[in-house]
Design a protein with these regions (language model features):
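Short, polar/flexible loop-turn hinges at active-site or ligand-entry regions and domain interfaces
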Residues: 86-89, 106-108
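Alpha-helical scaffold elements adjacent to nucleotide-binding pockets in ATP/GTP-utilizing enzyme cores
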Residues: 48, 93-98
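Conserved short loop/helix modules at catalytic or binding sites
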Residues: 34-87
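N-terminal cationic leader/targeting segments used for protein routing and processing
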Residues: 3-7, 61, 108
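Short arginine-rich
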Residues: 97-106
Length: 112
């Protein structure tokens, strides 16, 4: 008997809406990531920040956050939780709402 059961991947995982802020200019970015590391929010966000930095250095994109991470360095930025939302669709909707309301300077995709 096969003990491994194929299950549909959950789509209602907890999602973390977070900010990354430049401590000198106070410009910030709002983003979304799936909660990982068995629910450890700090480790999840620390890993996401590492990914942002890695992508900024490797891909040379002209996106707001990538550009300032390259120019100013990761040491100048702090990150934290705005809120945790259950489910991918509600989280994306909430992130879009927050971006449209808060209008963070480093979000350059113009979410509407």
């Amino acid at each position: 008997m096969n003990s491994k059961i194929n299950r549909k991947r959950r789509t209602d995982r907890n999602q973390v809406i977070y900010y990354i802020q430049d401590v000198e200019t106070l410009e910030y970015y709002v983003g979304l990531t799936a909660l990982s590391f068995k629910g450890n929010v700090f480790r999840t966000l620390r890993r996401r920040m590492q990914k942002h930095m890695q992508r900024a250095l490797a891909e040379n994109k002209n996106w707001g956050l990538s550009r300032v991470l390259r120019e100013r360095g990761a040491e100048r930025f702090i990150f934290g939780v705005i809120e945790v939302v259950r489910g991918k669709r509600p989280a994306h909707a909430r992130e879009t709402e927050l971006i449209n309301t808060m209008q963070p300077a480093l979000n350059t995709f113009g979410v509407k």
